[in-house]
A protein has these predicted regions:
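Accessory N-terminal region flanking or inserted into the helicase ATPase core
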Residues: 1-17, 27, 44-46, 123-131, ...
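Conserved motor-region signature of P-loop NTPase helicases/translocases
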Residues: 1-64, 137, 141, 145, ...
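Conserved ATP-dependent motor core of P-loop NTPases, especially the RecA-like helicase ATPase domain
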Residues: 5, 9-11, 49, 66-259, ...
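Conserved ATP-driven helicase/translocase motor core recognized via long
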Residues: 19, 44, 177-345, 716, ...
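Nuclease catalytic cores
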Residues: 55, 59, 461, 692, ...
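Accessory C-terminal helicase-associated subdomains
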Residues: 322-326, 340-344, 501, 526-532, ...
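Flexible, glycine/threonine-enriched loop-and-boundary segments that flank and lead into catalytic domains
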Residues: 355-380, 392-407, 675-699, 908-948
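C-terminal accessory regions
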Residues: 607-632, 686-692, 740-800
């Protein structure tokens, strides 16, 4: 075992394989602190991870360590020893880091890529509009709009409707039961990324002999009849086999291509026949009660029948693949024309641009020019959670990292990850990149494993080691995995081995689902969860299980939080009642909403406050809302009855009232908009102590809980072959035929084998992640095997059953380590307090009046704009937006009056000097929005061009505000009277942002090609 205390954290190129709980965030923080302490500038360090939460934790870790070291000599000495530093002034290091935080590249890979594309959008070919990143609900809404447009009547006008529907019918061949929109959404979700990254990939596996699909219907009856006619020559070994064989032949005869009938056959003999034909052996030995051989005319006819059906199924899959490509291509063309060409890009588009250099020489040269400019600003790379890195991520990063890692020791690479926690393969994570780094890209990189746990006590690790270290059982159940599972036993850090830190682990049997939930409640009650100062996580595989278990625990008195996020409008009864109140206010004719209100406790309060007549009630309440906003009137309705609600219900009501107060601040008084506001509301939450957090295992990654319960260990075989949707070869991609057909296609069979090996590895990693969340208590519930249970099935449940069992196992408890009363070592919480009242909300903030800087111009001189003049002005602004620094690149201008005017501006020596960088450190912004509070009003405007001059330390010393004016004035100086108010408003705003800088407003007269300084 490698001792992490021996790791030289400042080794130039270092790969740390950090097991769960071993302190990877700690090592990342030490690396950054060491680099800065050695004199490296924080802004030349890039640290990338996969979630904003992880990035925030990393930043907190760095600042907390530095603050402790700066204030405590003992902490300073310990940090120096761990990092390998000479005596260090951590006050200075802390100050350096804090000053550099705005320029410190700490965040997600996605945000880093977006930052690069935003900085070099024109170099990346985004010229149709300003780069705008689509993410979250906005991205989903736009995708839905495009999907709707694909199947809308607008396609008729484009002449695409018949083409699209034809492709779609082929894509859904044999699967017509799905709705059009549902099927299309599934295709897009499954295939769009494949399409964008498949420029040189064949759609459909090679070497497949296509047949006419009609051949099956033409020949199946002849072949089936021949098979039945020859049955008498078969030597049966059981009298029941004759009828069974006839039934199977009829079942095969009744099969329809694409229907999936044979895949779902309940007849064991039919399955036997399909498997026997797939082996391509000379004789067909099958089993029905006993083994017997299908030979003679019957055997030949059955073999020919099954092989013909398989060929037709393969052809159908190939045609579906081609049709899917056509459907996704139409969708992608709409994305290109409606989004990407206009600068609207999602994270996947950004990754595509960052990895485009691999596709052709022109793209490589373009990326090389961009990297040359970026490379000088980055010396040190830190990559976190490397097992979750996708090939798309790596392709985008590698050109930059390659420069740093192959340079001298002044430039470094630090990678940390854990192969055993690779649970995001389904979204592209490629654990094989570890091998690619060590074997191909950086064969000289130092590798250091970490197995000591700073999270889990010895009793928890005993169970983890027993299960995850049992590679013999793993291999016998699961066979080969990709990659292979590597294990070394974990040990607890010394401070966790003291008697006061000990814990307990147990694996026990449950009889059924009802018993599972009741036993879970009993375990949490036995441990006094909610009464002692400890955290508890209940981890499951699916969102449906999260909901089921949360509701059951809540009904049994536990304070429960799901998934770390809450939806207060829909996940509780008070929230539903409040939402329906808003629905009724939005539409008083909504009978359902009113019915919910009449059955809820809100009805009596509404009558007391606003009268018994519902029409008068609606008018009274909407009148109050028009005066006070939504939060105050609704708080008056809720508060009188909230005292009778659970703590959970009161929290949810407070969430909604706070959200409505935020909505009131927008100035909107529409009940419909208010309803949509709270229905979309999701609030991040921290469970704290005394709360039970129920979440999926994926969501739990990176977290730790004093108590972990795993009540739903899957007993299904791994993998579930019905989830094999895309077959991939080195140079091809295909939709998948039914499972029985795949055995008859070597290419697809091999592709499925690779997929299955990866699925098995990910399932093993999933269980490892779940087990290693536990600090002090780990409780696993397993279904008790029945008489017909296949205990050799490749399931996670069987793995635990085989590995955890020992000589002390009983009928109730399979494994146990430690003392069940360990929780008494944890202090109790304070006695329960009285129910907390609804929080008092501040008065809603009135929406500020909005003004624009252009309203500040002198109205007596305001020109009257003609449509042609406005069009000319818009064209000039659009062309000038494309102008970067003319000493770096010359803009390509079209032939137009506006282009001639822009060319004239660039030719002017005084204006040209303003548009040149001349090697200075200047940040350039075009069409920059500017918002500020001026005299109590919200000022909002767009600055045509903004220059921020920085000194050698990065401080802004001069700000140039540049506005282009196309007014037909007699003299350029006539613009001063017209626009001095507007420019002074901009100047005042920028002066507040940069108080120590010189702020210079500049007008450019397009008509006279002159500069005017104000």
């Amino acid at each position: 075992m490698h001792d992490e205390e021996q790791i030289k954290i400042l080794e130039p190129n270092l790969l740390i394989l950090a097991s769960a709980g071993s302190g990877k965030t700690y090592q990342l923080g030490n690396r950054v602190i060491g680099l800065v302490a050695k004199g490296n500038k924080p802004e030349k360090i890039v640290a990338l991870t996969f979630t904003r939460k992880a990035a925030g934790e990393f930043a907190d870790s760095v600042l907390t360590k530095l603050a402790k070291a700066a204030s405590d000599p003992h902490e300073a000495a310990d940090l120096e020893q761990r990092i390998g530093l000479e005596p260090t002034n951590f006050d200075t290091v802390l100050a350096t880091v804090v000053r550099s935080l705005p320029r410190f590249n700490l965040g997600t890979i996605d945000s880093f890529f977006a930052k690069i594309v935003r900085s070099f959008q024109y170099e990346f070919g985004i010229t149709g509009g300003k780069f705008d990143l689509l993410e979250g609900p906005r991205a989903s809404a736009i995708a839905d709009e495009i999907l709707a447009s694909v199947i809308s009547s607008r396609l008729d006008a484009e002449g695409r409707d018949s083409k699209f529907l034809h492709a779609f019918r082929r894509a859904t061949m044999g699967r017509e039961s799905q709705s059009v929109l549902k099927a299309l959404s599934k295709f897009i979700e499954t295939w769009h990324e494949q399409y964008r990254n498949a420029d040189d990939v064949q759609w459909g596996p090679p070497g497949i002999a296509h047949v006419n699909l009609d051949e099956w219907e033409k020949q199946k009856h002849t072949l089936a009849n021949a098979a039945i006619d020859g049955i008498r020559s078969i030597i049966f070994t059981d009298k029941r086999q004759t009828d069974a064989l006839q039934d199977s032949i009829e079942e095969i005869r009744n099969h329809t291509i694409g229907s999936g009938n044979l895949s779902n056959s309940s007849k064991s003999l039919t399955k036997n026949i399909l498997e026997a034909v797939a082996t391509q052996s000379n004789t067909l030995v099958v089993k029905s009660y006993k083994d017997f051989t299908l030979d003679g005319t019957t055997g030949d006819a059955i073999r020919e029948m099954v092989e013909l059906a398989a060929q037709c199924e393969l052809t159908a899959a190939f045609r579906r693949t081609a049709a899917i490509r056509d459907v996704v291509r139409i969708y992608d063309e709409l994305c290109e024309s409606q989004l990407r060409k206009k600068g609207l890009l999602g994270f996947s588009d950004v990754k595509y641009l960052m990895g485009e250099w691999k596709k052709n020489e022109a793209a490589r040269l373009k990326r090389e020019a961009i990297d040359f400019r970026i490379d000088a600003s980055i010396d040190h790379w830190l990559l976190d959670e490397f097992q979750d890195t996708s090939n798309a991520d790596w392709n985008g990063l590698w050109p930059l990292i390659n420069e740093a890692a192959s340079d001298d020791a002044s430039r470094t690479l630090f990678v940390v990850g854990d192969r055993k926690q690779a649970i995001y393969g389904w979204r592209g994570g490629d654990v094989g990149l570890f091998k690619k780094i060590t074997d191909e890209h950086l064969p000289g990189i130092t590798t250091a494993p970490m197995y000591r746990s700073y999270r889990s006590c010895p009793e928890v690790l005993e169970l983890i080691n027993k299960i995850c270290g049992d590679t013999a059982t793993m291999h016998s159940l699961f066979g080969e995995t990709s990659p292979s599972w590597e294990w070394e036993n974990h040990v607890s850090a010394p401070h966790l081995q003291s008697e006061t830190k000990r814990g307990h682990s147990r694996v026990e049997w449950i009889e059924n689902d009802e018993g599972r939930l009741d036993r879970l409640v009993a375990i949490l009650n036995e441990l006094e969860v909610g009464k002692r100062n400890m955290t508890c996580g209940v981890l499951v595989r699916s969102n449906e299980q999260v909901t089921e278990i949360s509701e059951h625990l809540r009904a049994n008195g536990f304070d429960v939080i799901e998934e770390g996020r809450r939806k207060p409008a829909t996940d509780n009864q008070p929230g539903i009642a409040i939402t329906q109140l808003l629905e009724w206010l939005a539409n008083p004719a909504d009978r359902f909403a009113r019915g919910v209100l009449e059955m809820s406790p809100l009805a009596d309060i509404l009558r007391n406050l606003h009268g018994n007549d519902w029409n008068a009630m609606w008018e009274s309440l909407t009148r109050e809302i028009s005066i006070h906003g939504f939060s105050t009137p609704l708080a008056a309705v809720i508060t009188p009855i909230a005292v009778d609600w659970s703590e959970f219900g009161r929290r949810r009501a407070n969430d909604l009232l706070a959200a409505l107060a935020d909505f009131d601040a927008t100035g909107c008084k529409s009940p419909r908009d208010a309803t949509e506001w709270i229905e979309r509301l999701e609030i991040a939450q921290s469970p704290g102590v005394a709360a039970v957090q129920v979440m999926t295992i994926h969501k739990s990654k990176g977290l730790g809980f004093d108590v972990v319960a795993l009540p739903n260990i899957p007993d299904k075989a791994v993998p579930q072959t019905q989830h094999f949707e895309i077959a991939r070869g080195e140079q091809w991609i295909s939709d998948t035929p039914p499972a029985w057909v795949r055995r008859m296609s070597p290419e697809i069979d091999e592709a499925e084998s690779r997929w299955a090996a990866a699925q098995r590895y990910e399932a093993i990693c999933m269980l490892y992640v779940a087990l290693t969340r536990a600090k002090r208590g780990l409780y696993v519930l397993l279904d008790r095997p029945g008489k017909n249970t296949d205990v050799e099935k490749a399931s996670l449940s069987n793995w635990i059953q085989h590995s955890a069992k020992n000589s002390e196992s009983t009928d109730e408890i399979l494994f146990e380590s430690g003392k069940s009363n360990w929780f008494t070592l944890i202090e109790p919480l304070e006695a329960a307090k009285l129910p907390s009242p609804l929080g008092k909300l501040q008065n809603p903030v009135r929406k500020r009046a909005t003004v624009t800087p252009s309203q500040s111009k002198n109205k007596t001189h305001a020109p009257t704009h003609s449509p042609s003049g406005m069009k000319f002005g818009s064209e000039v602004h659009a062309l000038m937006e494309q102008v970067t620094w003319i000493d770096d690149s010359t803009p390509a201008l079209p032939k137009s009056d506006a282009a001639d005017a822009v060319a004239k501006l660039i030719a002017s020596p005084t204006i040209a000097s303003l548009l040149k960088r001349n090697g200075k450190s200047i940040d350039l912004f075009r069409e920059q929005s500017a918002d500020a509070i001026v005299d109590g009003q919200l000022m909002t405007g767009i600055i045509d061009r903004l220059h921020l001059h920085r000194d050698s330390s990065g401080i802004v010393t001069r700000v140039e505000i540049i506005d282009y004016k196309t007014d037909a004035v007699a003299s350029a100086h006539d613009l001063v009277d017209r626009y001095s108010g507007q420019m002074q408003a901009y100047q005042s705003t920028l002066q507040k942002i940069h108080p120590n800088a010189e702020v210079v407003p500049i007008l450019i007269s397009v008509k006279h090609a002159e500069l005017v300084y104000l």
